[in-house]
Amino acid sequence: MRADLRVRDGLRACADLLKRQSGRIAYAGNSVTAQRASYRVPLHERLVNRFGQAHAAVGAGLGATGAMGTLFTLPELVLRHAPQLCFVECSVGDIGTRPPEQSIGPVVEGIVRRLGAAGTAVCLLHLYRDDSAMGDANPVVRAYERVADHYGIPSIDIGATLARAFDRQQMAKTDLLMDGIHTTAAGAGVVADLIAGALDEIFDAPPRAATAMPPPLHADHFEFCSLLRPSPALVRDPGRCHDGRFRLVYPYLAIEADNAVVLRTGADSIVGLLLVTGPHCGDLALAVDGGVTEYRTWDRWCEGELLRTVVFREPVRPQATMTLEVLDRCTRDDRGTPPLDGGRRLLKLAALMKHTRRGGAGDDGEQRA
């Protein structure tokens, strides 16, 4: 079985480099990339064997944060390692988290431009989930592919390949997938084989003449962005917040219910936030210019703690005052409000996501407010 792929400009120059010397290959994506039984482990073994070099694997998978979470953690999880090649697997996450459709292309373009500026080759991966159309029938995939077309980036569509195989009963879904999304050990091997087979064609494609990075496809692309780490000074009642660390590593500020973050945006817009979800999480109310929008942070994956994103339906404009209130309730679509073992609900805020329309000092890193 052959994976659906678009070679475009291919990766011949990258393949030649990986063959000549040892380097790093990054795997940026969402939970299917991060999970223990992930395609990335057998795929990396196949790539090391192909090139005959002991390339280091850079794992940069998060939970279902979509492209937005990958973009804003790119400096910390990928760029500082200076990989020669980066696989980007975020479309399945975007299908699940449902960010505003108009934001997907600009965010994916931000990932591509930041990797390209660092000299890192890119290949897009579309994986499978059973609760949505796959391939070009899905608007999320189409948004990714428009960016790939513009920049000549290869893409491999495992989602469309497996959907067709399942429909034709060539493979049993339960053999490859634990829950309709995440792979079993056998499924990880199948996905890795399909990707490796597609890469044979992508790596061997005749090289095209080197060209400069093309002008942006989207006027509001996200090449210039950074994380704004919260501090108690941003909180309305600083006495009801405390520092914590997600899995003992990733810092956050825990803010109790009926408290709020209050921020003047300055010259940049705030497009969302990076937070730790789990049994503690509650609804959020964002107030800007007298209007209030509520966001639900709970979903079916919140039985344990996960690093996730909330993407605002409309960015908070520059020179605005935003108030982000943590409500002492939690709405979920399927089974009502989940139980909470004592205490009040919390927002475990890792960072606010800041978008700068033009490059400037600090655009590649993070700040603390």
Model-predicted segments: where are they?
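Serine-esterase "nucleophile elbow" of acetyl-processing enzymes
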Residues: 1-63, 73-84, 263-266, 272-287, ...
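Cell-envelope and extracellular/periplasmic
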Residues: 5, 27, 31-32, 59-70, ...
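Active-site segments of SGNH/GDSL-like serine hydrolases
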Residues: 89, 93, 109-145
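Beta-strand-rich ligand-recognition modules
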Residues: 279-357
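Glycan-recognition and processing domains
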Residues: 204-265, 274-276, 335-369
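Extracytoplasmic/secreted cell-surface and envelope-processing proteins
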Residues: 36, 94-104, 132-137
